Amino acid sequence: MLSTGVKSLDELLGGGIAPEVLTQVYGSFATGKTTLAVQIGLLSGGKVAYVDTEGGFSPERLAQMAESRGLDPEEALQRFILFTPADFKEQRRTIGSLKKIVDKSFSLIVVDSITAHYRVEEQRKNLTAELGKQLQVLLWLARKLGIPVIVINQVHFDSRAERMKPVAEHTLGYRCKDILRLDKLNTPGLRVALLERHRFRPEGGMVYFRITEKGIEDVLGREE
């Protein structure tokens, strides 16, 4: 298990981010998805394969989070191996290449987000099968190396259901055993995490957290 660095969130997840499974973290813009993933990688102590499809990864933000926690920012930056695929085809190649790159020195794989390029291109051709193959590679890596994989997902408005839903909901839902939704609240900096699915924890549990210089913090100030 990898700690999120937030006691209440770890408790919600049954101890933290589990190895050997895909954990989906989804939500609308600026809900803390990237910050959460970066924080988990920062605190993991090992290398992190970070696939950034949206340009949301900030070395400056990582350094700030490390420094705020009394960690060496240079050492933290060196542990993050960044990949920046420009389109869905390059994303496929990047995820495929992880089979040769990621080894036992890595503690986490993050794809942020798994559906950004998929959304852009899905109108032109059916990419659902290809997305499923990419998820299967990530699941294979998680099981082979015994590490967690976090796939960040976007949302879209479903007019039939009249609510926001994760992109490619069924494709990701089929392979992601743990699903966490992040939402904004009216109070600035305050967010809520809702457990939508888990292998052994009850669904529907929620915790509140803050976004600060340190990254993600418990509203009550409790840390692991």
UniProtKB/Swiss-Prot annotation:
Keywords: ATP-binding, DNA damage, DNA recombination, DNA-binding, Nucleotide-binding
Single GO MF annotation: damaged DNA binding
Family matches, as InterPro entries: DNA_recomb/repair_Rad51_C (IPR013632), DNA_repair_and_recomb_RadB (IPR011939), P-loop_NTPase (IPR027417), RecA_ATP-bd (IPR020588)
GO biological process: DNA recombination; DNA repair
Coiled coil: none
Domain of life: Archaea
Function: Involved in DNA repair and in homologous recombination. May regulate the cleavage reactions of the branch-structured DNA. Has a very weak ATPase activity that is not stimulated by DNA. Binds DNA but does not promote DNA strands exchange.
Assigned protein family: Belongs to the eukaryotic RecA-like protein family. RadB subfamily.
Protein name (Swiss-Prot/TrEMBL): DNA repair and recombination protein RadB
Lineage of origin: Archaea, Methanobacteriati, Methanobacteriota, Thermococci, Thermococcales
Gene name of the record: radB
